[in-house]
Structures are given as C-alpha cells and as structure tokens.
Amino acid sequence: MNVIEKISVVMCTYNGEKYIRQQLDSILQQTYPIHEIIINDDISTDKTVDIIKEYMIRHDNIHLFVNSKRLGAHPNFMVALEKASGNYIAISDQDDIWELTKIEKQIACIKGYTLCFSLSRAFG
C-alpha cells in the first residue's frame, strides 16, 4: 500500500514579487500532493504579501505569516520551520522554480531511510 506522506513546504520571503508567482505555481503543480505551504515574510516592502494573499484565496493549503520585525534570512527560516506539521519538510527560496516531479522523486528516493538530506545547486 502506498502511503501519501504529509509534505510541508517552507518558504521565506522578502521583496520577492519578481519570482514569487512562478515559484508558487511550480509548488502547486507538483505531481505529489503538498499538505501545506508555510510562508514567512520578513516585512516585504513590495507586493510580495499581496501576491501571496491572492494565491491564498484559491489555495487553502497556503499559510502566510508576516514577522512583526525584520529577522533576516536565517532566523526567518528558523521561525518558519517551527510552523511546519508535515512528515517531510521541503525548504524553498522565493525565487526557486521547481521541476514538476521534484517532491515525487525525493519521496521515492528517501522512503525507508530514517535520515535523509537533499542538496540542490543553482544554475544559469
């Protein structure tokens, strides 16, 4: 029997309006179901939060949190990670664009292991 694992995607944003739509689309179109998308915004001054709110209207698995003070990248991710409830957590930057089978392939690869780490590289 194939068990569908609960996948949490954790993303931090800060002034990411240029790429946030493409990244959210690439997450939402994954071939493996995404349980929740946790987005922690570090007080963006552009339209990042407005764009995310537009997506939240259509997708109830997107959860937006906005910091009350600017934390910076690392502390912002630490806060966001604490909010994830899935069996597996996929970390995403706001300007990533995922291959449609990214999560499906990762889950197939790590099933059966008690500890797994996956590394991605930038290209282009």
Please provide the spans of the model-predicted regions.
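Nucleotide-sugar donor-binding/catalytic module of glycosyltransferases
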Residues: M1-G124
